[in-house]
Design a protein with these regions (language model features):
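Short, charged, surface-exposed loops that flank catalytic or proteolytic processing sites
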Residues: 2-24
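Non-catalytic, well-ordered alpha-helical segments in soluble enzyme domains
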Residues: 208-231
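Acidic/polar loop patches that form or flank catalytic/metal-binding clefts of enzymes
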Residues: 2, 34-36, 152-157, 226-238
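Short alpha-helical patches at coil-to-helix transitions and adjacent helical residues
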Residues: 5, 139, 213-217
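Substrate-gating cap/lid region and adjacent catalytic-acid/histidine neighborhood
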Residues: 19-207
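Surface-exposed intrinsically disordered loops and tails
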Residues: 5-10, 235-241
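Active-site nucleophile loop of the alpha/beta-hydrolase fold
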Residues: 1-2, 82
Length: 241
């Protein structure tokens, strides 16, 4: 590098012109750029950060396209799962006691499973508040901003499915229902034919889950074709409003 320590690097960077900065970055290798990004602070401080470079991302930040009606726009679907943060809370040992898997789980190599939600009311409260905040920031507010700025091709959903079984005494509907990433299963219907998913994860809810998957795929395919989920590709579902 051009500096031996952080303060010297900051001073050097602040003294560089935009052209010098551009030249320096364009001459860096992909490996150097990714290494610097990976070592940036705060580490593990959240999702990948967005840089307001004024080109890829507007100078006003990631929310600018939602309020600036002069920027190019395309139809958009925004959405979250009802209990997004359950995926993370269930792995927090302060909330959930984990232990050795039994029966088929031991046989297929699952070393640990959730055995008890230690404080269910607290677990549910933490999940509700944090998931509601996620929904407000990721779906509701951007959608309202788009509509308020005159853009009507804006659609919102919430994924609520939580019909999961009881496993080793733990109600997985409470533990992980409608959690982050659970909806992905419904977008790849071949997964429903997987033995573990069909007979362990979904069990008695298979028919309902498959129907929901078919409806989601129909709406989303129609959106991809036309920019409006409407009544789905089959044109026989409730109109998305």
């Amino acid at each position: 590098g051009k500096a031996d320590e952080i303060e010297g690097a900051k001073a050097l960077q602040n003294s560089m012109s935009l052209k010098e900065t551009e030249t320096f970055l364009r001459n860096a290798t992909p490996g150097e750029l990714l290494t610097a990004y990976g070592e940036a602070n705060p580490k593990r401080g959240g999702m990948t950060r967005v840089f307001n470079d004024g080109y890829v991302m507007g100078k006003e930040g990631i929310s600018e396209p939602f309020v600036n009606d002069q920027m190019p726009r395309v139809p958009i679907i925004l959405g979250t799962n009802r209990y997004e943060t359950k995926l993370f809370n269930m792995m927090n040992r302060r909330f959930v006691r984990w232990g050795e898997g039994e029966g088929i789980f031991s046989w297929i190599g699952v070393d640990e499973l959730p055995l008890e939600i230690m404080r269910p009311d607290f677990y549910n409260a933490v999940t509700q508040y944090s998931s509601d905040s996620w929904k407000e920031r990721a779906a509701d507010t951007p959608a309202r901003q788009l509509v308020a700025s005159g853009y009507k091709k804006t659609f919102v959903y919430r994924f609520d499915w939580d019909d999961l079984p009881v496993i080793q005494g733990v109600d997985y509907g409470v533990l992980a229902g409608a959690a982050h990433a659970l909806e992905i299963l419904f977008l790849f219907p071949a997964a429903f034919d997987n033995f573990i998913i069909k007979n362990v994860v979904i069990r008695d809810s298979y028919d309902g889950a498959k129907k929901l998957s078919d409806q989601m795929l129909s709406y989303w395919a129609q959106f991809a074709y036309t920019g409006d989920p409407g009544k789905g590709r089959s044109n026989d579902l409730p109109k998305w409003k």
